[in-house]
Curated annotation (Swiss-Prot):
Protein name: Polyketide synthase 3
Keywords for the protein's UniProt record, in alphabetical order: Acyltransferase, Transferase
Enzyme Commission number(s) from the entry: 2.3.1.74
Organism for this UniProt entry: Rubus idaeus
PANTHER family: CHALCONE SYNTHASE 1, HYDROXYMETHYLGLUTARYL-COA SYNTHASE
Gene that this sequence comes from: PKS3
């Protein structure tokens, strides 16, 4: 007779969860940040609000973003004028867009990841799908399963309305699924479109304008599995540990509320301070088992949030400027894509590591950290182990 313990042992993988492929995608519509204030105030018929426009111009100038990608074009917004007002009922129009476009953009990123992985998509056993853009039943996980032609028996998990920390959550879940299910290959997808948050300006809700200055659209996909097949699968990073915590005294620091007017965004000014004040505690807890206390000895993947968060984290930890270079570059080239950002940064780090001739996928270093920050304030901390870089 086989015991339960024997069954459990047989179900578990031997090695750590490993990222085997990464794919990214954006909508084709590219928006230049330098001209965005003129466009935004024109399309929302708010050009007469000159003082508010000047404030928004300053926000965009300070954002350190060069360009963003957006599904919403001028044509789409002209066809849906309610989305251009500050508080007009518009959820139906927004939902009609995102329930179609979120899985489509996710498919683009997933297709690239599957191609890099090089295996049959029938070997994907689990699907984790994450979005803060729109809610539907059956969800985007179901739609993506159909779009990609995955097996009907693929085990799906749908994550809605988590926000900017969720790229870390996706990695944490994929790690647990891969390590506790021998032979599992997990496709994890983050797909975000700002059609749910776009709205006109308001004098009394300046934090909404911060969101209009920062957020962009993008999707990223990874494939995660333990015990990579030699000479068939190419490891990129190993997922060593993953933790989540709610920061003290941070209630209401970042909120989003789904209403008839879409998803409203609320932000307190002390968010950068709250994150920078607490980040070392998360680092100490994550790296104590490895006896690492030099944060400059790590490669860094941090959700960009906005430039103020990065500046304060850098100063608080005494990080060298190059540590957050990949993070700042993704913010500059794409804006804040919510949950997808950290996976874009992970992709950038491994690609530049190869291009620059580093010995490992982590900029030549062995250990790294991935941080996700978002509503709560919630922080996800993932410890990464690089592997030998291969061209």
């Amino acid at each position: 007779m086989v015991t339960v313990d024997e069954v459990r042992k047989a179900q578990r993988a031997e090695g750590p969860a490993t990222i085997l492929a990464i794919g990214t995608a954006t909508p084709p519509n590219c928006v230049d940040q330098s001209t965005y204030p003129d466009y935004y105030f024109r399309i929302t018929k708010s050009e007469h609000r000159t003082e508010l426009k000047e404030k928004f111009q300053r926000m965009c100038d300070k954002s350190r973003i060069k360009k963003r990608y957006m599904y919403l074009t001028e044509e789409i917004l002209k066809e849906n004028p309610s989305m251009c007002e500050y508080m007009a009922p518009s959820l139906d129009a927004r939902q009609d867009m995102v329930v179609v476009e979120i899985p489509k953009l996710g498919k683009e990123a997933a297709t690239k990841a599957i191609k890099e992985w090089g295996q049959l998509k029938s070997k994907i056993t689990h699907l984790v799908f994450c979005t803060t853009s729109g809610v539907d039943m059956p969800g985007a996980d179901y739609q993506l399963t159909k779009l990609l032609g995955l097996r009907p028996s693929v085990k799906r998990l749908m994550m809605y309305q988590q926000g900017c920390f969720a790229g870390g959550t996706v990695l944490r879940l994929a790690k647990d699924l891969a390590e506790n299910n021998k032979g599992a290959r997990v496709l994890a997808v983050c797909s975000e479109i700002t059609a749910v948050t776009f709205r006109g300006p308001s004098d009394t809700h300046l934090d909404s304008l911060v969101g209009q200055a920062l957020f962009g659209d993008g999707a990223a996909a990874i494939i995660v599995g333990s015990d990579p097949l030699p000479d068939i699968e190419r490891p990129l990073f190993e997922l060593v540990s993953a933790a989540q915590t709610i920061l003290p005294d941070s209630d209401g620091a970042i909120d989003g509320h789904l209403r008839e007017v879409g998803l409203t965004f609320h932000l307190l000014k002390d968010v950068p301070g709250l994150i920078s004040k607490n980040i070392e505690k998360s680092l100490n807890e994550a790296f104590k088992p490895l006896d690492i206390t030099d944060w400059n000895s790590l490669f860094w993947i941090a959700h960009p949030g906005g430039p103020a968060i990065l500046d304060q984290v850098e100063a608080k930890l005494g990080l060298k400027p190059e540590k957050l270079e990949a993070t700042r570059n993704i913010l500059s080239e794409y804006g804040n894509m919510s949950s997808a950002c950290v996976l874009f940064i992970l992709d950038e780090v491994r690609r530049k590591s190869v291009a620059n001739g580093h010995k490992t996928t982590g900029e030549g270093l062995e250990w790294g950290v991935l941080f996700g920050f978002g509503p709560g304030l919630t922080v996800e901390t993932v410890v990464l182990h690089s592997v030998a870089a291969s061209t």
